[in-house]
Amino acid sequence: AVRRRMFGKEKRSSCHLVEEMEELGLSGCENQAVSELSGGMRQRVAVLRAMRMDADFLLLDEPFRGLDAGTKKKTMNYIRRKGKEKTMLLVTHDLEEAEAMGDWICTCSRLDGILEIKRNSKSSTEI
């Protein structure tokens, strides 16, 4: 079940987990097996598990894949809030997601070998 998998080595209270599940729209699936959830719900469970880890660095690979616009916005807000004290590398194919989430943006293309790194300040000062 979702809740049981969330508490493996966790020391955090179930109260915080319930709040975070509500924030991500996962209320009501606490006792379901992850394999029974939709793709979008599984994605949010994966984000929840990653963000609750006691790690200084997180790699988030396409964390918004399969999410509708409203759920994507909630998930972005959750990651921003929970990730304030963490270093995160977020991989995405969506430049708008990168601009919304990143302090620094690295774009690369295999086709023409372009690698560009910018500080994300909406004016994007290149380094």
Question: For each predicted feature, which ranges?
Answer:
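Conserved ABC ATPase signature
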Residues: 33-37, 41
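Conserved H-loop
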Residues: 85-92, 94-101
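Hydrophobic anchor residue at the start of the ABC signature
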Residues: 47
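Helix N-cap at the start of a conserved alpha-helix in ABC-type nucleotide-binding domains
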Residues: 69-70
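Conserved signature/switch motifs of ABC ATPase nucleotide-binding domains
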Residues: 53, 84
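Catalytic Walker B motif of ABC-type/P-loop ATPase nucleotide-binding domains
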Residues: 58-62
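Conserved ABC ATPase "signature" region
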Residues: 12-29
